[in-house]
Amino acid sequence: MDTPRDDRRPIRIQRITVTLRSTSLILLAALTLSGCKPTPSTTASTTPIAAPAADASTTGSITGVVHFDGKPPERIAIDMFADPACARSPQPNFTEQVIVTNHHLANVFVYIKSGAPASAVPSGTPPVVLDQKGCRYIPHVIALQQGGTAEFRNSDATVHNVHTLPTQPNNQSADLTEPAHSKPQTEPFNAPELMLPVRCNYHPWMNAFINVAPNPYFAVTAADGSFTISHLPPGTYTLAAVHETLGEQDIQITVPPKSIAKASFTFATR
């Protein structure tokens, strides 16, 4: 049959005689149709989700101590007498930037820096508490997992303020006024960040630090410099220790199945 040949011929002529306006319309239609195609979502790859539970029969842990080498800087006495309520707190009070006991360093944030997947805090995890007591932030350093919340309390008989100063855009700055013995307020922290400063606008000596970890494997050293990170899947990790004024140190550490790996860091005055 000759019908197919006849159908093709007028189409060929139509394409030759098409105007610029028609060409533009055809291109616009093609672009519109291509734009209707679904594009892959990047949310799953950029937004951390709760990590699956590790096999409890194989997990291990890391225990260690953070040491301080040399003579620690002298802690400076704080004058709280500008506020009568603060003046009634136990005196004297001292700065907390570097606290060393028997060559062991407190308030160091220790966490798995690499080797563990980033994950958000599981739903229902209680907030981490930062209290204002004795006109101080207690504890001086706190840590939570990204996606978690911090709860700010005021246990004092005077007004306080919680002013957070994040550098990560996904962590919103908070400037919270908290009257004496007021109801606690909470704030979310959605992005990993180290040593995020907290200040009180009413009492300039008050300061603390919030650490937002990318995974659930972290700790803050106690007064004796000790720390423990539990429930780690077997593997090799980069373990980081971060101090507010002394900086950061990293080491490689391997956690065998059902075992305890030992770690040690040593800081000194810069």
Q: What role is predicted for each listed range?
A:
Residues 23-34:
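Bacterial N-terminal signal peptides
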Residues 11-25:
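Bacterial N-terminal signal peptides that target proteins for export
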